[in-house]
């Protein structure tokens, strides 16, 4: 089993791990010849987070070898990984490799620091990890969801977080509603009161014809644009997701009525050469 690579895009990798650090303690890091997966499947909630990146998005001189079709699965403590990446911010070169010490697998991040007076200096952070068997990870599947009934860009997450923080004290369920006319609403219904906050003038992203066979028959196109789709969500799930407000550049929310709220969280700018996206699957609740 062998893994070694240079980090070519430290900024994007650091932002990705920073976002994950706000969600859970450990992530499943799946290293494959063409792609790198970061996955969080919390045991205590029904929300899952998946990110699939092409290798060249963050790495170069990439080598991964194993007896399992050159796939390596690791359980990585996110906080330790994030701290190591953050410390490498101004390094001239950074590499990551899988190593072992006293039978403990390690993810070793080595950073090179160049100075005029004393030449180069190399600092290595060793992060204890757990190697996951293929049989263990084979039962973890990315959720599937039907085509969305509504898709909309969310407003700035800081604004949403402010509202959700207030509403969670009123109820453990928050209703998120949206339509194809650029409207989004958060509301709480309790016996003593009904409170809501509405945003207007948001953008509904266009569907990609290469991804949708017949756009005219897509669920988001067959209902009236002003008709709302309602999702009843756990307030804790929303609070957990909104912790990434400091690193998210833009978020597309896909409302799959009766199934799940799927959120595509972009942590890179549209003009960036490579795109890094986190996909959240948040289960909905039926009254």
Swiss-Prot record:
Gene inactivation effect: Cells have a nucleus that is cleaved by the septum or the septum divides the cell into a nucleate and anucleate compartment.
Protein's name in the database: Checkpoint protein hus1
Keyword check for Signal: no
Assembly, per entry: Interacts with mug40.
GO CC term, one of those recorded: mitotic spindle pole body
Main location: cytoplasm
Residues with the Phosphoserine modification: 210
Family: Belongs to the HUS1 family.
Role, per record: Essential in controlling the S-M checkpoint that couples mitosis to the completion of DNA replication. It is also required for the response to DNA damage.
Origin: domain of life: Eukaryota
Keyword DNA damage: yes
Entry's Gene Ontology BP terms: cell division; double-strand break repair via homologous recombination; meiotic DNA integrity checkpoint signaling; mitotic DNA replication checkpoint signaling; mitotic intra-S DNA damage checkpoint signaling; nucleotide-excision repair; telomere maintenance
Localization of this protein: Cytoplasm; Nucleus, Nucleolus; Cytoplasm, Cytoskeleton, Microtubule organizing center, Spindle pole body
Organism: Schizosaccharomyces pombe (strain 972 / ATCC 24843)
Taxonomic placement: Eukaryota, Fungi, Dikarya, Ascomycota, Taphrinomycotina
Gene name of the encoded protein: hus1
Keyword field: Cell cycle, Cell division, Cytoplasm, Cytoskeleton, DNA damage, Mitosis, Nucleus, Phosphoprotein
